[in-house]
Amino acid sequence: MSAEKMTKLEENLQRAVALKKTVDRWRNFHIHCMWQTTLDQRRNLFAALRMKDTKEQELALSNKQLLVVRQAALHELFEKEYQQYQQELNQMGKAFYEERL
């Protein structure tokens, strides 16, 4: 073989090796990307489940708090009505019967 052919053959071999390295890097990168994508999908699923659970807990707590506030407002309303009714009865010269213990 001549020196030119030998040089050309070595250049082709180097190009082939470089191409193989590039393809291997691309394959590894692709595998890593696919793995990362599935990992992100699983993380997103678990994050969504945690968020849903947290939202349900917050909703339950807010409903309890709303109930307490409404009960307090209703109690205050009844107390005001009782005081008003008692004043009206006092003006008429009447009173509620209260049992003493």
Swiss-Prot record:
Indicate the transmembrane segments per the record. Answer: none
- Report keywords, A-Z: Cell projection, Cilium, Cytoplasm, Cytoskeleton, Flagellum
Its chief place of residence is: cytoplasm
Q: Name one GO cellular component term.
A: axonemal microtubule
Which InterPro entries does the entry link to? CFAP141
Which GO biological process categories is it annotated with?
A: flagellated sperm motility
Localization per Swiss-Prot or TrEMBL: Cytoplasm, Cytoskeleton, Cilium axoneme; Cytoplasm, Cytoskeleton, Flagellum axoneme
Functionally, this protein is described as follows:
Microtubule inner protein (MIP) part of the dynein-decorated doublet microtubules (DMTs) in cilia axoneme, which is required for motile cilia beating.
Kindly state the subunit structure of this protein: Microtubule inner protein component of sperm flagellar doublet microtubules.
Descriptive protein name: Cilia- and flagella-associated protein 141
Please state the gene responsible for encoding this protein: Cfap141
